[in-house]
Every structure is written in structure tokens, then in C-alpha cells.
């Protein structure tokens, strides 16, 4: 808003036919008509505009107004609290999380006890190390502490525990060998996901996630009939041809309708869904490209999350606030997870998946017309992966479990925002 006004107000020919009083009156009328402008902000804006000596003074008033609006729409405390209450209604409580943590703790200890017993005679020194690790695991309190300890203990770089477990494999039964292999596979340090849970625990968590999200869909302000009608507009001949002769794959009509209902019908930027066998993507031209023959619709939900953000600029401010709240350390430390030719910038965060912390630096155009990417920043990122990763949780069992167990707050944010969007009418 302010960028556009700045261009107008600094172009001395654009407003040559308007008097200062006419500019003031038009500015106040415009602000009065904006739904996203809290009425509490308007008196100060009117006063600042009235006192302006020239167009630059009016622009200064607009900048102050936008700053207050951004701070207001970027507040996530209220919606996150709403989402937390919704999760509680579906059994996702601190007590439930602690049960999962205890189960996970017990499972790891049981596996390490196999190692300690196997090496008691063969290598007493290594057995003693394992017993100390067991003691530390049993003493850890809270999911965050357990996750952090396991990610460090099983890190093959600089820790001897994985090697000790490998040594113990020579002295165990086939059943115990399988148990140790699973232990190493799940907890050896992975910078993308950090740690994993067993299938039983993942299923237990995801069942409750689906319950909460399906309830939000069922209670939507958008009827199923209206949502299916919207979804039908994307079932083109191209889509039908891509699906011809294929068994299984995404039920595009149902998935789109569910997303539309969950978000209160507040997706306006999507104009086309195309079949694409490469990496899925969404863009500002209205496109979502995914493999429609995939058995899992998580990519479709992920990409629709971008259009949810595109369609509701206030959600970008909320996403920025969410990211700022999850910075690891005093200030963001950015890493490139892409390549030199096509960098993908993420910052080190407390989130369960590094991709959640991805930012999109704004671009600038040089005097020669070359597009250059500016330095990565959270405050000025032009888009995020926050709502994309949140919607993905509907079909991604592993990501959903890891996010909730890590205490990301991602699902709470989504459910709170979904309720707000559905109540907006």
C-alpha cells in the first residue's frame, strides 16, 4: 500500500489536479473503507492527515497506519490460543504429549539395555557408557529435552554411541538386531527431521490431528455443495487427460473441497491446477502444479497453503510473527539448503523441520535490468512455508507427529486461523 502511494505522492504530475484538502479527504475516506483497518486506529490517522502540510505528510500518516495494521494482523497469540483449545477438544493435551514422550523414552531405554547386556562381558567400558546414557535419558524431563538429548547422543559425528551399538550387533539375536537397526535408523542425526517416532506413536498422534482438522472442515461456514462446485472449476480436460487410464491417485475434487471448507472459502488466487511429475510448486500466476497420480495428496495441500497466504495478505504477517518466535538464538542465522544457482534460504530454528523456516528474499532490479535477490530476512520475506507446512500435516503422518511432539505450535496456528477465516463472514 505505502509503496504504491509513495510512487504517486512523489510524482508531481500524478496529483497536479488535486488540492491538498482533496487529497486529505480522499485518504480518510479510503482508510474508512478498508476492512483490515481496525476502527481504533482511525482517529490517530485522521488527526495526522488533517495536520499534514503536504503530500509527504499524508504519506507519513499512511506509513504509521500501515505499521499499526501490520502489528495488529501479525499478532498470533489469540489465534494460537484458539487452536490450542481446539486440539484439547480432540485429545491433544500436554498429558497426551507426555504419554508419547514416556513411551518413546521407555522404548529407547529398552533397546539400549540390550546393548549394555550384550557388551557387559565383551566390552565393560562401552557397557558402562551405555548405562550412563540410559540414566541421562531416564532423567530427561519434557519432550524438548528428550528430543535434544537423543539428537545429540545418536549423532554419528563426534559421538561414540552409534559405534558402540554397531559393536553390540555381533552379540545379539536376530530379533534384537532388528530392534537395534531400527534404533539407529530413527535416531541417527538427520538435519532435516532431527528425530523420528515409531509407527504406533505416529498413528496415535495423527489420528487426533485428523479428528481436529476434519471437525473444522465439517463445521465450516462453507457448505459441502458450494465447496464441490468450486472444486469442479479446476477439473479441466487437461486434468482429466492426465488421469485417464490411471488407477488410484488424488481425488482432486474432494481434496480441493476439503481445503476450501477448512479455510472458509478464503482462497481467491488459485486459477488452475495442472498435472506435473516434477517437483510440485505454486506461483502468483494462480497455478498449482502437482503429480495428480500420486497416492498421497500432501503435496496438493502444501501448495494450496501458498495460495491461502497469497489470498490473505494478513496471513503473511502472522507467518512472519510465527517465524520470529521460533528463531534459535538471539537473531536469525541463515543457511542455504539449495545451490549457488538457485538458493533456498532457511534460518536455524526450534521447529521440527528446517523447511518450515524457509524465507523468500525480496528481489530488486539493477540499473541494467538484472533481477537480484536481496539478503534473506524474516521481516521482509515475500512468502513463507508456514501455512503450506501446516496444511501438509493433514496427509503427512510423520510431519504431523514430529511437529506436535516438538511443540512447534504450527497446527494450533492453522486451526485458530481457520476458525477466524470461517467467522469472517
Ranges and model annotations:
Residues 54, 119-120, 142, 146-149:
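Noncatalytic nucleic-acid binding interfaces
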Residues 2-38, 42-48, 59-64, 74, ...:
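Active-site-flanking segments in enzyme catalytic domains
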